[in-house]
């Protein structure tokens, strides 16, 4: 396979007089420009593209034009971000200044493919592997505030790139847009589920096992009938529970409700099965979370849209999936609640660092999650203490030159880290200001101060890291229903360890089913409205760190997404951390005595 690719690089397209007809190019151009990049092409611009493809690809245009058109579309999106219509006057300079001709494009792919298929790559030493991974295509950390913002177009049922840049001081309409986006993402996901797809031929075919959603506005005049609704749980000022969708709302009677597996609180999007009463109430029989959709199914539904702004197409991702098999032993070490104002923290950290310093294979990266102070950071009086904590950490790290040289350190802020207002921080949260960590940067060769949440891209794997004490927030705000689910024993009769595992599974299922890291109303969990998309869990990540210091360590696999939490570093007389292997989706929890 390598020889054929090399040949295609060395042999340039034949420079013969060949003309591609616009009508012949139209299907490919439509697929690339319209379906993939949401751009519209008029007749003149299609003619210009056909002429350009004729010159670059010649008689081999059918097999070679798609990568070329992809590069042109990417360049257009970068240069004319707010112009969705590709016009000929603007297209001509784009084609003239295109710096990535087709043969170079193939060469870059060939290089990746050669890396992944040759034995020298698969059998290379650790040092050679790290040198290769330095390329940003293989490893990068995505900041929540630098991700592209996509809006959901409900009429076309597609995501489109927002023309307006998000701001910290968003208008009131941003709150409405935020809720609409959450609703439509989950609603479209439900409709793709086979249980909600009505057979094309009804007649003699049984429809057992399929469900149909009813808009709330359609309940009027249909008292006494049973319906399945979908909407947002809200609490009215008088304390009553309501269900809202995009058009209407209805008050719920949950006195006889049987809840499904998971946690339910105001702000959650739920499926409700029940009967509409003549009094205007909706008597709930069952209440549950939307069905989950696996990552590959979501990516297929999005037509492999580059929703994270990685600038990699499906072919490149396929090559990376093959290449990453050589890195199954590469580990991410995750440590949480690293209080730098506690001397025992440094004792535990040095024990962990020494373990890896003396081993042959050091971790690929070490993720240190806050809070980095045991009390909330205040604008007055905390700055000196906060910086001294990181200076002490830098002094401690100097004892371990091997990991400082070869391991990447990622710092994720927690609830007590700057900046907070009366101990409350908005989500997403900016990275730790560099003023406090300049000594860390001098000691460690590779340091990344990430936002909260952040996404770590490792080859084709997406590892989502979110630091929040979310389990306690769910416990404080969860709703109580009239009936206990069938088959559920008295909670007091279950051992404490099993209760914790049960709650952890509920937590993971709820977050992934909701496709959002913070399914709470703004009064419960304040959010920057214009950046709410950064908290979305759609499509599912390859792996997710739900870092919660109030919960014990766990490792839960659900929907094809391994979810982990190392718990607090210090817990009683033990210190805890986890090793995550993103390629083989394996998680190892460590617990050792101080």
From Swiss-Prot:
Principal localisation: nucleus
Gene Ontology CC entries for this record: chromatin; cytosol; DNA replication preinitiation complex; epsilon DNA polymerase complex; nuclear replication fork; nucleus
Report the superkingdom from the record.
Eukaryota
- Where does the record say this protein resides? Nucleus
Coiled-coil positions: none
Q: Which Pfam families match?
A: DNA_pol_E_B
Entry keyword DNA-binding = yes
Question: Which keywords accompany this UniProt record?
Answer: DNA replication, DNA-binding, Nucleus
Q: Does the keyword NADP apply?
A: no
Q: Which GO molecular function terms does the record list?
A: DNA binding
Q: Which residues cross the membrane?
A: none
A Gene Ontology BP annotation from the UniProt entry:
DNA replication initiation
Q: What does this protein do?
A: As accessory component of the DNA polymerase epsilon (DNA polymerase II) participates in chromosomal DNA replication.
Q: Share what the entry says about its subunit structure, partners included.
A: Heterotetramer. Consists of four subunits: pol2, dpb2, dpb3 and dpb4. Interacts with dpb3.
- Other facts: In eukaryotes there are five DNA polymerases: alpha, beta, gamma, delta, and epsilon which are responsible for different reactions of DNA synthesis.
> Record's family?
Belongs to the DNA polymerase epsilon subunit B family.
What protein name applies here? DNA polymerase epsilon subunit B
Q: Which organism is it from?
A: Schizosaccharomyces pombe (strain 972 / ATCC 24843) (Fission yeast)
Gene name as annotated: dpb2
